[in-house]
UniProtKB/Swiss-Prot annotation:
<feature type="binding site">
    <location>
        <position position="138"/>
    </location>
    <ligand>
        <name>Mg(2+) 2</name>
    </ligand>
</feature>
<comment type="subunit">
    <text>Monomer.</text>
</comment>
<keyword id="KW-0540">Nuclease</keyword>
<dbReference type="GO" id="GO:0043137">
    <property type="term" value="P:DNA replication, removal of RNA primer"/>
</dbReference>
<dbReference type="InterPro" id="IPR022892">
    <property type="entry name" value="RNaseHI"/>
</dbReference>
<dbReference type="GO" id="GO:0003676">
    <property type="term" value="F:nucleic acid binding"/>
</dbReference>
<protein>
    <recommendedName>
        <fullName>Ribonuclease H</fullName>
        <ecNumber>3.1.26.4</ecNumber>
    </recommendedName>
</protein>
<keyword id="KW-0255">Endonuclease</keyword>
<dbReference type="InterPro" id="IPR050092">
    <property type="entry name" value="RNase_H"/>
</dbReference>
<feature type="binding site">
    <location>
        <position position="14"/>
    </location>
    <ligand>
        <name>Mg(2+) 2</name>
    </ligand>
</feature>
<feature type="binding site">
    <location>
        <position position="14"/>
    </location>
    <ligand>
        <name>Mg(2+) 1</name>
    </ligand>
</feature>
<dbReference type="InterPro" id="IPR012337">
    <property type="entry name" value="RNaseH-like_sf"/>
</dbReference>
<keyword id="KW-0479">Metal-binding</keyword>
<feature type="domain" description="RNase H type-1">
    <location>
        <begin position="5"/>
        <end position="146"/>
    </location>
</feature>
<keyword id="KW-0378">Hydrolase</keyword>
<dbReference type="InterPro" id="IPR002156">
    <property type="entry name" value="RNaseH_domain"/>
</dbReference>
<feature type="binding site">
    <location>
        <position position="52"/>
    </location>
    <ligand>
        <name>Mg(2+) 1</name>
    </ligand>
</feature>
Length: 154
């Protein structure tokens, strides 16, 4: 018996930080056929790498059923971490090759869990290079930074 084909979803993500650490934001664009959804958020005290990770996590967690996902990021940290480094980290009990604890382990574990229902192909593009969806994700991330700055003043 053949299983039905997975729906195809395209995701573009970005993270931003005002200071590193400092207030940060993330943005994601999800596209399924003609349907598009924008997501964004922020945290008052964070790092750029955490926001890059949270953009991918939030986008994947927003999917309601298993999908074939093409996820594009401008973060080598995220792409390399999830396609190359994570396997060794898991084997080493979430420690790096030199036995130090993995930074942002909470988010790496959350990303690992968010991937499980899906088939994800990871793509990297150069940031701020005129790629329209990356520019839009960056704008959403900057809006997330603005939201995070407001959170700090409350």
């Amino acid at each position: 018996m053949n299983s039905p084909a997975l729906p195809h979803v395209t995701i573009f993500t970005d993270g931003a930080c005002s200071g590193n650490p400092g207030p940060g934001g993330w943005g994601a664009i999800l596209r399924f056929g003609d349907i598009e959804k924008e997501l964004k958020g922020g945290e008052p005290h964070t790092t750029n790498n955490r926001m890059e990770l949270l953009a991918a996590i939030s986008a994947l967690e927003a999917l309601k059923r298993p999908a074939l996902v093409d996820l594009t990021t401008d973060s080598q940290y995220v792409r390399q971490g999830i396609t190359a480094w994570i396997h060794g980290w898991k084997r080493n009990g979430w420690r790096t090759a030199d036995r130090k604890p993995v930074k942002n382990v909470d988010l790496w574990q959350r990303l690992d869990a968010a991937l499980q229902p899906h088939q994800v192909r990871w793509h990297w593009i150069k940031g701020h290079d005129g790629h329209s969806e990356n520019e839009r994700a960056d704008q959403l991330a900057r809006e997330g930074v603005a939201m995070a700055k407001l959170m700090r003043t409350v």
